[in-house]
From Swiss-Prot:
<dbReference type="GO" id="GO:0048509">
    <property type="term" value="P:regulation of meristem development"/>
</dbReference>
<dbReference type="GO" id="GO:0009739">
    <property type="term" value="P:response to gibberellin"/>
</dbReference>
<dbReference type="GO" id="GO:0009737">
    <property type="term" value="P:response to abscisic acid"/>
</dbReference>
<dbReference type="InterPro" id="IPR006456">
    <property type="entry name" value="ZF_HD_homeobox_Cys/His_dimer"/>
</dbReference>
<keyword id="KW-0862">Zinc</keyword>
<dbReference type="GO" id="GO:0009640">
    <property type="term" value="P:photomorphogenesis"/>
</dbReference>
<dbReference type="GO" id="GO:0003677">
    <property type="term" value="F:DNA binding"/>
</dbReference>
<keyword id="KW-0217">Developmental protein</keyword>
<dbReference type="GO" id="GO:0009735">
    <property type="term" value="P:response to cytokinin"/>
</dbReference>
<dbReference type="GO" id="GO:0045892">
    <property type="term" value="P:negative regulation of DNA-templated transcription"/>
</dbReference>
<dbReference type="Pfam" id="PF04770">
    <property type="entry name" value="ZF-HD_dimer"/>
</dbReference>
<dbReference type="GO" id="GO:0005737">
    <property type="term" value="C:cytoplasm"/>
</dbReference>
<dbReference type="GO" id="GO:0042803">
    <property type="term" value="F:protein homodimerization activity"/>
</dbReference>
<feature type="zinc finger region" description="ZF-HD dimerization-type; degenerate">
    <location>
        <begin position="39"/>
        <end position="88"/>
    </location>
</feature>
<dbReference type="GO" id="GO:0008270">
    <property type="term" value="F:zinc ion binding"/>
</dbReference>
<keyword id="KW-0963">Cytoplasm</keyword>
<keyword id="KW-0804">Transcription</keyword>
Amino acid sequence: MMKKRQMVIKQRSRNSNTSSSWTTTSSSSSSSEISNVRYVECQKNHAANIGGYAVDGCREFMAAGVEGTVDALRCAACGCHRNFHRKEVDTEVVCEYSPPNA
């Protein structure tokens, strides 16, 4: 009689360039990965042209338009492009594992 076990691994990445990999060494396993992306505080330096540093204080990206339009990439709060907002990626990996027969 084999028992199936389910394991959930959650990881939060603050950098979009961070890559992670999961490996399994079991005889019978399956996994799925779910990623949620959100854009938080704006990091645009509004004083760069005068040699200073000043951000506008926008805390979270809110799309100015519906998905598929140009305004979907512009923040309704600060007017900046979405790329100026820090990207957070929440990744959840769900694995189902059946131990090998002994």
